[in-house]
Swiss-Prot record:
It comes from Yersinia pestis. Keywords: Cell inner membrane, Cell membrane, Membrane. It is a peripheral membrane protein. The keyword Ligase does not apply. This is Protein Syd. Its main location: membrane.
Length: 183
C-alpha cells in the first residue's frame, strides 16, 4: 500500500527527531538557522536553535508556480512542501546522502517558490522534462527530484538529462530514507 505524502513525511520527520533525541538527548539543532525566525524554534542556544516541526499554517499550495509557468505540478510536490515547517533533515538512501529540503518559515516558502520557478525555467530552456527538487547532495550539481510527469523520485544532474531512479513514488522515497545526524 502506498502511504500518502503527509503520512510518509510525518513518519520520516519523527524518525529524524527520535534519532536526534536518542543520540544527543535533545531536539534537532541547527547552527545554520540560528537567528532566522521560524515557528519551529523551540529554544535558542548560544549558537544554534533547537526545533520541532509545526503545522503549515495558513494552508498553502504551489499554485503561484503553476500560474507563473502555466504548468500543472504533480500533486505530491504540493503535499511535500506545504505539510509542515521544519528544518532541513539529513538522510541516507543506499550509498547516497541527502539533505531533505523543508520550509522553515513563510519567508522561506516564498524563496522556495522562486527557486522552483528558476529550476523549471532552466529545464524548459534546456528542453528537459520538468522535475522539482526535494533534496540536495554533497555535490552542488546533483539532487533528488520529483519527476513532474511520472511522479518518480530521481537522482539528477542539474542542467542534464542524466537521471537515475531512486523510488517509484515520493512516499516510497520518504519511507526508504534512513535519518542521519549532520557531521
Amino acid at each position: 500500500m502506498d502511504l500518502n505524502i503527509s503520512t510518509a513525511l510525518r513518519s520520516f520527520t519523527q524518525r529524524y527527531i527520535d534519532l536526534w533525541q536518542q543520540q544527543t538527548g535533545h531536539l534537532p539543532a541547527s547552527k545554520e538557522l540560528y537567528g532566522v525566525p521560524s515557528p519551529c524554534i523551540v529554544e535558542t542556544g548560544e549558537d544554534q536553535v533547537f526545533w520541532q516541526p509545526q503545522a503549515f499554517l495558513p494552508e498553502a499550495t504551489l499554485t503561484n508556480i503553476e500560474r507563473a509557468l502555466e504548468i500543472q505540478l504533480h500533486p505530491d510536490i504540493h503535499d511535500f512542501y506545504t505539510q509542515q515547517y521544519a528544518g532541513d533533515m539529513m538522510a541516507d538512501l543506499g550509498n547516497h546522502r541527502f539533505t531533505l529540503l523543508q520550509v522553515w518559515s513563510e519567508d522561506d516558502f516564498i524563496r522556495l517558490q522562486e527557486n522552483l520557478i528558476g529550476h523549471l525555467v532552466t529545464q524548459k530552456r534546456l528542453k528537459l522534462s520538468p522535475t522539482l527538487f526535494l533534496a540536495t547532495t554533497s555535490s552542488e550539481m546533483t539532487m533528488a527530484s520529483l519527476c513532474n510527469v511520472s511522479g518518480n523520485v530521481v537522482l539528477e544532474q542539474f542542467g542534464s538529462d542524466k537521471r537515475t531512479l531512486l523510488a517509484s513514488t515520493l512516499s516510497h522515497f520518504l519511507d526508504a530514507l534512513r535519518p542521519v545526524l549532520p557531521e
